[in-house]
Amino acid sequence: MTTLAFSYAVNLLSRREYSEFEIRCKMQEKAFSEQEIEDTLAQLQQKNWQSDKRFTENYLRARAQRGYGVNRIKQELRQLKGILPETVDEALMECDIDWSEIALNVLAKKFPDYRARQDAKNKQKIWRYMLSHGFFAEDFADFIGNGTEDEFY
């Protein structure tokens, strides 16, 4: 492992958490050899300076605070950040996030008059928005009326 590769990775981590996949991609862009990348990642993980588990927990909290649901966050972690499904599931089980409360906050912010929107067209719009932001129907269906998901598709 070269000190240049290690310094580059430490510099990245000094600004924010990165997943192993993200560091690997950034180091490949800088044309470090695979051996340098492997050695650097091993040393970072040995010193506990890089941890996919810690990254996942922080990312989960940050995205939930920004108004995204479980499905969206899981997809981002797996596809964009290269986190293993087991790590994502473990972090979700350990977190104490009230997804229904987040769904209600998102609903109230995006659709302040959602209680008055009782026609089918407006309910469909709300359903599409909430589902596209990664919320399960159970997290928000009670807030927008007695309809079921099947009625809106």
From Swiss-Prot:
<dbReference type="InterPro" id="IPR053924">
    <property type="entry name" value="RecX_HTH_2nd"/>
</dbReference>
<dbReference type="InterPro" id="IPR053925">
    <property type="entry name" value="RecX_HTH_3rd"/>
</dbReference>
<protein>
    <recommendedName>
        <fullName>Regulatory protein RecX</fullName>
    </recommendedName>
</protein>
<dbReference type="InterPro" id="IPR053926">
    <property type="entry name" value="RecX_HTH_1st"/>
</dbReference>
<comment type="similarity">
    <text>Belongs to the RecX family.</text>
</comment>
<dbReference type="GO" id="GO:0005737">
    <property type="term" value="C:cytoplasm"/>
</dbReference>
<dbReference type="GO" id="GO:0006282">
    <property type="term" value="P:regulation of DNA repair"/>
</dbReference>
<comment type="function">
    <text>Modulates RecA activity.</text>
</comment>
<dbReference type="Pfam" id="PF21981">
    <property type="entry name" value="RecX_HTH3"/>
</dbReference>
<dbReference type="Pfam" id="PF21982">
    <property type="entry name" value="RecX_HTH1"/>
</dbReference>
<dbReference type="InterPro" id="IPR003783">
    <property type="entry name" value="Regulatory_RecX"/>
</dbReference>
<keyword id="KW-0963">Cytoplasm</keyword>
<dbReference type="Pfam" id="PF02631">
    <property type="entry name" value="RecX_HTH2"/>
</dbReference>
<dbReference type="InterPro" id="IPR036388">
    <property type="entry name" value="WH-like_DNA-bd_sf"/>
</dbReference>
